[in-house]
Amino acid sequence: MAFNVSALGFGDNVVDRYEHIRTMYPGGNAVNFAVYAKKCGAARSAYMGIFGNDAAAEHVIASLEDEDVELAKCKQLIGENGAARVTVVNGDRVFLGSNEGGIRGDTRYVLDRFDLAYMKQ
């Protein structure tokens, strides 16, 4: 059931690399918001942020496309995508380190008038 609601997740995207099972999961608060808005029935859901150009970024992009989340206003730059190294100890997640957001941590997203118009839709 779709609702006449539009949602936009703006900000972070990362992969959590679970080292003990050699598996990457996409995430980040803004990405998760956009995905769950779509799953909960938003007629339109988008993510707006900065991706790197590595395998982690391509994994997040493909995952968002699979969830029918719009990516029209994203930027993809040369560099590592945000990533965290994770394992599980006694059933709890343990974060082993990260690359501090990768390229997104080093680059500000500067909004222009076209971005602002898109956000109002």
Per-region residue spans from a language model:
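Short glycine/serine/threonine-rich phosphate/pyrophosphate-binding segments
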Residues: N29-A30, N81
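Conserved N-terminal subdomain of the carbohydrate kinase-like
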Residues: V15-Y18, A43-K120
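Conserved acidic residues
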Residues: V5, K120-Q121
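Conserved strand-loop elements at the edges of beta-sheets that form or border functional pockets
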Residues: G9, G27, Q76
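Positively charged, low-complexity intrinsically disordered leader regions
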Residues: M1-R22
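Histidine-anchored nucleotide/phosphate-binding helix
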Residues: A30-K39
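Small side chains
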Residues: G9, A37, S45-A46
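A short, glycine/small-residue-rich beta-strand->loop->alpha-helix junction that serves as a flexible
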Residues: I21-N29
